[in-house]
């Protein structure tokens, strides 16, 4: 799977938010999108999945996304927004089963195998045993994990997530992104907006840096030097220091210091 974005410009009404943004995503990679509030991160995700009018091209395996039917687009692309939009009483299992909707026919219901896959997805994100719990009674973090499980069963080639870590604690954030990376395998890609640059540095294969609707630069935490990453990150966050340390298991981690 290859996503190619060419000269994307988008906004709301007469106000332009994104300016001539171009980049590519490759299968098996998780790309983080970093930028301050108002930089255009959410606008970019909404534009990619067709929720906002835009100019430029968005190609998935060389096919323009705007040429796909809504159903075909839902099979190929999945967006997890900052809020689920679910306001009714519904079980956690039924929320996850919504992930199969794009693959079901008219009046067709999920079968036994789909229900088992949904249970496995809930267990994978840490919600095993909560299948029948009312979604509305879950914590905000648990709701985010439930929506992630819904996305995992959908098996879309492109996964887009808008600040999925916002309602999660320290360990939950790393667990969620670890589950996403495991889900990607070799055939899928993810684009994730994040507020925490240190989390992004340690979980993402590549980072895109946005400021005022413009794509400033990109970096690869496992390849770029500390000096290059400091220089690029300072374009968004100001002067900072980046350190490479080992955690208690001896694995290298990147730490940001202001």
How does the language model describe each region?
Residues 56-64, 73:
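Conserved ABC transporter NBD signature motif
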Residues 159-163:
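Catalytic Walker B motif of ABC-type/P-loop ATPase nucleotide-binding domains
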Residues 49:
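Helix-to-loop junction immediately C-terminal to a conserved catalytic motif
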Residues 134-138:
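Conserved ABC ATPase signature
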Residues 34-36:
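The feature captures the beta-strand-to-loop junction immediately N-terminal to the Walker
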Residues 194-195:
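H-loop/switch region of ABC-family ATPase nucleotide-binding domains
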Residues 229-258:
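ABC ATPase nucleotide-binding domains
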């Amino acid at each position: 799977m290859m996503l190619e974005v060419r000269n994307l410009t988008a906004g709301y009404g007469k106000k332009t938010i994104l300016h001539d943004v171009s980049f590519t995503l490759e299968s098996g990679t998780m790309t983080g999108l970093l930028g301050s509030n108002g930089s255009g991160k959410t606008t970019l995700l909404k534009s990619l999945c067709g929720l906002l009018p835009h100019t430029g091209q968005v190609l998935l395996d060389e096919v323009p996304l705007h040429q796909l039917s809504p159903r075909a687009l839902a099979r190929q692309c999945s967006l997890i927004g900052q809020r689920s939009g679910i306001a009714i009483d519904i079980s956690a299992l039924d929320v996850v089963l919504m992930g199969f909707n794009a693959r079901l026919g008219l009046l067709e219901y999920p079968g036994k195998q789909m229900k088992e896959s949904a249970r496995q997805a809930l267990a994978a994100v840490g919600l095993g045993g909560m299948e029948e719990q009312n979604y509305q009674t879950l914590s905000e973090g648990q709701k985010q994990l439930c929506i992630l499980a819904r996305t995992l069963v959908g098996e879309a080639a492109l996964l887009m997530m808008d600040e999925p870590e916002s309602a999660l604690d320290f360990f939950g954030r790393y667990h969620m992104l670890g589950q996403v990376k495991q889900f990607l395998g070799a055939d899928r890609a993810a684009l994730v907006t994040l507020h925490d640059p240190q989390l992004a540095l340690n979980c993402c294969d590549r980072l895109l840096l946005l400021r005022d609707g413009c794509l400033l630069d990109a970096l690869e935490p496992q390849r770029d030097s500390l000096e290059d990453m400091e220089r690029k990150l300072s374009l968004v966050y100001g002067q900072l220091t980046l350190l490479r340390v080992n955690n208690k298991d001896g694995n290298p981690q990147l730490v940001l210091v202001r």
